[in-house]
């Protein structure tokens, strides 16, 4: 095993708890009128999930803060989070959840199961599901507009996140090309565009925005961007593999859907073994990018290794 499993489990558990506390505070109560939309938003946000994007955001902020305050060799895990960064992480999770709600709709992936429970449109109907996704997106930007960092950093973060969720090299653009590539023989350029845009873009923005929140320099942002792009692509490659090798019960979502829909995936192009090798190579690249930060980067490196060894 290439990472400290116990440490990663602790980071994931504490990160999920911190994100959930803030999400509970920020989301309207289920009893708030109009109740249907708020129940649907909460159904999807609190369905479980790894909270990977908030955790990466918070840990990037912790690393940059540790490096800037005490020097890169000063120890990593004991460093404190930049005050208020949890709100930024919560906004990123809202955006991620909105994308899942819309991806699951009949017009797109047509999925019935997400995080081990009925998808939003199965529980509340398509109309409310569409609106719940829209509502999470708009609330995310309301939260981003109020995060507690200098105005210049706040604007840069909003720009970064908006680009990552948009049409040019962003989440929506990746989804469009993914739809267009169905039932066609995949090529590497198209496959990389889909995965880098649809998945890696928001993961990258999570890491970069966490660094920006903590006062990252231009050089820091460049390193964080390379790290985020590398682990984001590795994450999606592993997702492609798990879709073929795990059951629906293990994944908490319908297994085998990519193959059935003839989607462009790394296993379809390279096979499972080579896909795993490529994911591992990307993780090594990501970790090497953070060597500048010494022990302060240990948690982000451990998280990168976790991403390729996870089973769901």
Kindly give the residue locations of the regions a language model identified.
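N-terminal amphipathic/basic leader segments beginning at the initiator methionine
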Residues: 1-27
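Mg2+-dependent prenyl diphosphate-binding active-site environment of isoprenoid biosynthetic enzymes
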Residues: 17, 27-289, 295-308
